Amino acid sequence: MSDWNPSLYLHFAAERSRPAVELLARVPLENIEYIADLGCGPGNSTALLDQRWPAARITGIDSSPAMIAEARSALPDCLFVEADIRNWQPEQALDLIFANASLQWLPDHYELFPHLVSLLSPLGVLAVQMPDNWLEPTHVLMREVAWEQNYPDRGREPLAGVHAYYDILSEAGCEVDIWRTTYYHQMPSHQAIIDWVTATGLRPWLQDLTESEQQHFLTRYHQMLEEQYPLQENGQILLAFPRLFIVARRTE
């Protein structure tokens, strides 16, 4: 599991794209020229940007070769670059930096967010959506299984929090719109929950395990999910998925 799996990621494409659509709807920009899609993945968020601003120059950034290859195949008219978000430098100031479900993987948000604001043009916008599910059973159980089986903690850090992000971006010279939404995804089985998180949140936990260790981990994880997520009357499971949204507009 050394690289991301675009096919597995896109298995829940509609659910993963919905937050991007809702984030994009709150971006207060009309005619713009330069856009960066940070953590573009297979290009599903980039396609939304291209639909809204077809004349803009859009660059998708991702560290995964597999994701970049998939995005290039899907959107040949857009530019895609394999790079680390923290080190990538645009050739010109950006009117919009769009980051849908990517920045949560990176550390040091107190430094990262002001850095991203510095890449914006005057009145440019930083639009961010991050899963805020560190305390949800899906992610708590990952840590518990790893502890039970004596594996090191490889999960991401929790988000800084609403008040912290507001202060970080206000001090960086932005007007800030911030909100949190909890989605309730209808899942047909506990295995479907595993399929969902295997493409994202479970990757760090599984990537260095042998095949037998992965199976042992997932078997125990499945058992614990059954205890935490009861079936609805119709047999479905409601998977709560909180997400944090930020639209920060540079005032300088």
Curated annotation (Swiss-Prot):
Keywords: Cytoplasm, Methyltransferase, S-adenosyl-L-methionine, Transferase. InterPro entries: Methyltransf_25 (IPR041698), SAM-dependent_MTases_sf (IPR029063), Trans-aconitate_MeTrfase (IPR023506), Trans_acon_MeTrfase_C (IPR023149). It catalyses: trans-aconitate + S-adenosyl-L-methionine = (E)-3-(methoxycarbonyl)pent-2-enedioate + S-adenosyl-L-homocysteine. It comes from the Bacteria. Its main location: cytoplasm. The keyword S-adenosyl-L-methionine applies. GO terms for molecular function: trans-aconitate 2-methyltransferase activity. Catalyzes the S-adenosylmethionine monomethyl esterification of trans-aconitate. This is Trans-aconitate 2-methyltransferase. It is found in: Cytoplasm. GO terms for biological process: methylation. Its EC number is 2.1.1.144. Belongs to the methyltransferase superfamily. Tam family. GO terms for cellular component: cytoplasm. It is an enzyme of class 2 (transferase). Coiled coil: none annotated. The gene is tam. PANTHER family: TRANS-ACONITATE 2-METHYLTRANSFERASE, TRANS-ACONITATE 2-METHYLTRANSFERASE-RELATED.
